[in-house]
Amino acid sequence: MKNTYPETFIKAPKKLDCFITTSEELIKEAQVLRYRVFAQEMGADLKTKSEGLDYDDVDSYCEHLIVYDNCNKKIVGYTRLLNQYQAKRLGRFYSENEFNLTEVLAMPGRFLEIGRTCVDPDYRGSAVLTTLWSALVQYAVEGGYNYLLGCASISPGPSGYAVEAVYRNIDAKNIAPASYQVKPSIPVPDSLRCQRDESGIPPLLKAYLRFGALVCGEPYWDEDFNCMDLFILLPLDQLKDRYSKHYMRGHQATNEIETAAIV
């Protein structure tokens, strides 16, 4: 199923543009970036029929949000967006492969799932993640969504993060109440829940938490991706005032998302 929405540009500072694309060429380039990050860097066992591409059935139903470097003419950041209507056509949210979301999805409101978020290794520590996150918040708030949901990954091993240390570094206000807690279909094995005192939180998870995201229970062990996934729920009502003051100040005329691009 092909997306029928027009390309929607969101202005970003300096050399970066962030926009939703329906271009098959750009989507394929994004899938190449995903493959580099998830398969080559993280060691994921991707169930793809095309070597060098990360592709699955969700790609045909979702929106593809990319950060594009105009100077080097390439995609340097990516996430995909799946709303509840697209998920219904697909048959599920991607996160439902890992968690039972029955109680969460029974809440009133509109849901937007984010996934496959990645940044080109050469651009980490730059403005790419901030640009991507700013555009994502703009899209969600202007689209009238009530919740962002998705999975934040924790890579284990010496070069990764210790899940217990991550939990110790999460503020109590970012731990979901019991009504939002979900159960993973495959819990993390005890052997991987190492207790070393490594500090720090993965950058993407840190960005979610900074905006008030809730960690909703125990992580899922994703053997294919060689990582632990935390289910994240971000209520958007609390972001609307912050968004309008921070992201829209002086940019109302140029940063609007076209109505046709919102489902």
Q: Where would I find each of the regions flagged by the language model?
A:
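Acyl-donor binding region in acyl/amide transferases
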Residues: 84-214, 219-227, 232, 239
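A broad, low-specificity signal for short, low-complexity segments enriched in glycine/proline
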Residues: 23-30, 38-43, 73-79, 108-111, ...
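Short, cationic low-complexity segments
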Residues: 250-263
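Residues that form generic nucleotide/phosphate-binding pockets
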Residues: 33, 169, 246
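Short, surface-exposed amphipathic charged segments that create phosphate/polyanion-binding patches used
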Residues: 36, 233-234
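Short amphipathic alpha-helix that is part of the acyltransferase structural core
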Residues: 3-76, 80-83
